Each structure stands twice: as structure tokens, then as C-alpha cells.
UniProtKB/Swiss-Prot annotation:
GO biological process assignments: translation
Functional summary from the UniProt entry: Allows the formation of correctly charged Gln-tRNA(Gln) through the transamidation of misacylated Glu-tRNA(Gln) in organisms which lack glutaminyl-tRNA synthetase. The reaction takes place in the presence of glutamine and ATP through an activated gamma-phospho-Glu-tRNA(Gln).
Gene designation per UniProt: gatA
Organism the protein comes from: Cyanothece sp. (strain PCC 7425 / ATCC 29141)
Recorded GO CC terms: glutamyl-tRNA(Gln) amidotransferase complex
Family membership noted in the UniProt record: Belongs to the amidase family. GatA subfamily.
Lineage: Bacteria, Bacillati, Cyanobacteriota, Cyanophyceae, Gomontiellales
Active-site residues, record numbering mapped to chain: 75 (charge relay system), 150 (charge relay system), 174 (acyl-ester intermediate)
Keyword Kinase in record: no
Protein name (Swiss-Prot/TrEMBL): Glutamyl-tRNA(Gln) amidotransferase subunit A
Length: 482
């Protein structure tokens, strides 16, 4: 599979045109979609028009950026003007946004070619992409298994080679966990590094947009294109954005890496434990100083998240009422009946469950006991990370406690589904950057991801460690046979 730089070289040397690259991607999608089902909407016409614009620039001698002419898939909770944005929900069936998200605007300005919108768990709530109202996405490594979630469509599209890069969103692990399950690179940036303007909100204090790629450099290039201050997002950080590729050095001498003790133990698949331990040994061989670090409140991340995220979701999802856009229940008796029936018929069971949990946690009698307490624990989790980063540069642990599970295996038991984000959730609560990269396979040939966690705005260190490991191992060159 080519990298962004290789495709860029082919474009500037006129070996291939952007139109040819786009046509190849669209053909591959047509060929593989009956098996993978990663896309909800294909934007072939717009993609070819964008590719032709890039070809015109090349023909007139205009210098093009590295992302110009590169096919990309976009998770379907990012607003794209004039193109359906469903969030995987029946309640937004037929919704066409009148405006563009900041990240997709930046990608269009960079010349990237959007080939389509990818499937997701409804409103990004889920860990398997089985909560989509539209279709089930398959894991390209084993079509009977889930790709992870909620950004399962984006992860599967990149793993299958339907597209080189993709965007996802991550509220509690929705980029990193599917990246682990599908054997690709996935990054959740520092909270506020990438604008959320035009991202349909799930939990606003946790949501963050990030890249999927087949290798670390492509992820770094994509982050560089979407990161940066945006006055349209009040939580956007006003910090300079470096060229992240300058930190890709295959040497870890002097780097201090901490293994989070609390991530090893009960609930961790022994094969995941074995493979990630081997990966950590490899980091040591590359010159890093590795030690064990305790984050005592790490295991409280899951219950804390399942109070805070549903509370924010119950407020954010109050806006879907059938009045202005999306689905409206037919023939309601009156206004109140229209509201209740639209929401009852439009939302799926997991979204309803989380709205109920959130409404309960925010109710007068329980606010202090649940929501306020969860916010206090969130602060303690942040403090554990702060203490850890006084001792080490980067923290490491498995991305997910297991490899990809069979479709339908966990749908009847929401709690077992929630546990698949055990390792990723604390990173969102603390607003830190976290990257998952492939580090091996289990005995069934399913990918395993290693999670690298950096301090606030230390994507540079995360990329450096990830790149050094990637260059010393063969995992990023392994692709599923479809």
C-alpha cells in the first residue's frame, strides 16, 4: 500500500494523475464494499471534480501540498455541506448540512479528495459499529467480526485499502479501539488541538477528531492538516502547530517510557498481554528506558465516563425533535406527541439508554451523588497522569483488552461492550493525546494495538516513539487478504 509521500511523488512526476488515483480508489471501494460495508455515502462525483482541480494545478505548474489528490474517507458525524450526514441514526435520515465542518474545509483547501462518508455507531455511541441504524461494517481481517467502534467504518476502510487515510472522532476510544481491532494507526489528539466545529456533538468535553492511517507518518501529516486554532470552537487551543513529521526519528535513546501497571491483570486477554509485553521489550531494545508506573485511579475511568458522557449526551441530543430537519414521526396527534414519537422511533436502543442514564445522573436528587462525584474523580485521574508525566515522557499499555470479537457477541450485554474501552477512556477524561499502532497478532491472526499516551500537546513524543517502533517492526506492512 502506497504512502502519502509516494502518491505525492507520483503526482508531481506526472507518473499518475489525481483523477487516476481517485478512480482507482473508487473502483477498490466498489469491489470491496459488498464485503466490508464501511461507507454510508459515496461522493464519487465531487471526488473526481476535486481530483481534476488538483490535476489542473499540476498542469499549470502550481505547487501542490502533500495531501493534494490523496483520497480520504470521513466519518459520518462530520458535517459536509450538501452531502448527507446521518451520524448512523434514523433521526438524521435525509439530513443535508447547510455548512461545512472546519476539518473537512481544511482538507478541501489542502486538495484532499473525499471519497465518501463512513459508517459509525449511532451518534458515535458504541464500540463495535453495530449500533448503526443503516448497516453492519465487517472487520477486514475476519468478516464475521466487528471492526470496533464507534469509528468502525473509517478504520475498516483504511485497513481494507479502500482509502489511504480517514478521519474519525474519539470520545472514549472511538478512534484507538477500532484502529487496534483493524490493525491500523489511529490517533486521538490533545483535547482542543483539532476544531470540533461541525462535529455532531456526543459529549462535548471529551469529543476529539483525529486521523486513521496505515503508517505513523501519514497520521502525522493528516494531523498537521486538520490541527490548529478555530474561532468557531470555543474549546479550540490557540497554539502553534509544528510539522509533526520532523519528530519522526527512529531512535529512542534517552526517552523514558512508563508501563501503566493498572492495565495489566484481570480482564486482559493473555495473548494481548503477551504481544504488548513483547512490543514494550522492543522499545527497550531501541534505547528507551522503560519502567512501571502506577496510575491508581485509572480503573475508575470507566464508571466516571459512563456518568459524564451520557450526562452531556442527554443535553446535546435534546435538539433532535423532528421540527426542522431529519426524521419526523408521521401523523402525530399534537406537538408533544410529535416530539415523543419522533425521538422514540428515531433513536436506537443504545442512544436511548445513554440519554436515560444521563438524565438520571443530572436529576435533582442524584446530581451530587453521581455527576458531581464523577467530575471530582475525573480530576483525580488527571492528577494521576500529571504525576506519571513528571517521571516519564510517554505512557504505554494495550489499546484494548481483547482482539476483535464476533458480530453479535456483546450486543445483549452492554456492560461487556463498555469494557472494550477500559484502556482508552481515561485518556479522554484527562484530555491527553493517545495513539494506537499495530504491534502484532493473536493466534487467530487478529491484530493487536499498542497504546502510546503523551502529556498535553506532546504529540511530538508520541509520534517519535510510534515511528521508532514501526520502523523496527513489520506489522504496518501486513494487510488483510480480501
Amino acid at each position: 500500500m502506497a504512502s502519502i509521500r509516494e502518491l505525492h511523488q507520483q503526482l508531481v512526476s506526472k507518473e499518475r494523475s489525481a483523477k487516476e488515483i481517485t478512480q482507482d480508489a473508487l473502483e477498490k471501494i466498489q469491489q470491496l464494499e459488498p464485503k466490508v460495508h464501511a461507507f454510508l455515502t459515496l461522493t464519487a462525483e465531487q471526488a473526481l471534480a476535486q481530483a481534476e482541480r488538483v490535476d489542473q494545478q499540476i498542469a499549470t505548474g502550481t505547487e501542490i501540498g502533500l495531501l493534494a489528490g490523496i483520497p480520504i474517507a470521513i466519518k459520518d458525524n462530520l458535517c459536509t455541506k450538501g452531502i448527507p450526514t446521518t451520524c448512523g441514526s434514523k433521526i438524521l435520515q435525509g439530513f443535508i448540512p447547510p455548512y461545512e465542518s472546519t476539518v473537512t474545509s481544511r482538507l478541501a483547501a489542502a486538495g484532499a479528495v473525499m471519497v465518501g462518508k463512513t459508517n459509525l455507531d449511532e451518534f458515535a455511541m458504541g464500540s463495535s459499529t453495530e449500533n448503526s441504524a443503516y448497516q453492519l461494517t465487517a472487520n477486514p481481517w475476519d468478516l464475521q467480526r466487528v471492526p470496533g467502534g464507534s469509528s468502525g467504518g473509517s478504520a475498516a476502510a483504511v485497513a481494507a485499502g479502500e482509502t489511504l487515510i480517514a478521519l474519525g472522532s474519539d470520545t472514549g476510544g472511538s478512534i484507538r479501539q477500532p484502529a487496534s481491532f483493524c490493525g491500523v494507526v489511529g490517533l486521538k489528539p490533545t483535547y482542543g488541538l483539532v476544531s470540533r466545529y461541525g462535529l455532531v456533538a456526543y459529549a462535548s468535553s471529551l469529543d476529539q477528531i483525529g486521523p486513521f492511517a496505515t503508517n505513523v507518518e501519514d497520521a502525522a501529516l493528516l494531523l498537521g492538516a486538520i490541527a490548529g486554532h478555530d474561532p468557531q470552537d470555543s474549546t479550540s487551543l490557540n497554539v502553534p502547530i509544528p510539522d509533526y513529521t520532523q519528530f519522526l526519528i527512529p531512535d529512542l535513546k534517552g526517552k523514558k517510557i512508563g508501563i501503566i501497571q493498572e492495565t495489566y491483570g484481570e480482564g486482559l486477554d493473555p495473548q494481548v498481554e503477551q504481544v504488548t509485553h513483547k512490543a514494550i521489550q522492543q522499545l527497550e531494545e531501541l534505547g528507551a528506558e522503560v519502567r512501571e508506573i502506577s496510575c491508581p485511579r485509572f480503573r475508575y475511568g470507566l464508571p466516571t465516563y459512563y456518568i459524564i458522557a451520557p450526562s452531556e449526551a442527554s443535553a446535546n441530543l435534546a435538539r433532535y425533535d423532528g421540527v426542522k430537519y431529519g426524521f419526523r414521526s408521521p401523523d402525530p396527534e399534537n406537538l408533544l406527541s410529535m416530539y415523543t414519537r419522533t425521538r422514540a422511533e428515531g433513536f436506537g436502543p443504545e442512544v436511548k439508554r445513554r440519554i436515560m442514564i444521563g438524565t438520571y445522573a443530572l436529576s435533582a436528587g442524584y446530581y451530587d451523588a453521581y455527576y458531581l462525584k464523577a467530575q471530582k474523580v475525573r480530576t483525580l485521574i488527571k492528577q494521576d497522569f500529571e504525576a506519571a508525566f513528571e517521571q516519564v515522557d510517554v505512557l504505554v499499555c494495550p489499546t484494548a483488552p481483547t482482539t476483535a470479537f464476533a458480530a453479535g457477541a456483546k450486543t445483549a450485554d452492554p456492560l461487556s461492550m463498555y469494557l472494550s474501552d477500559l484502556m482508552t477512556i481515561p485518556v479522554n477524561l484527562a484530555g491527553l493525546p493517545g495513539l494506537s499502532l499495530p504491534c502484532g497478532f493473536d493466534q487467530q491472526g487478529l491484530p493487536i494495538g499498542l497504546q502510546l499516551i503523551g502529556n498535553v500537546l506532546r504529540e511530538d513524543l508520541v509520534f517519535q516513539v510510534a515511528y521508532a517502533y514501526e520502523q523496527a517492526t513489520p506489522w504496518h506492512d501486513r494487510h488483510p487478504q480480501l
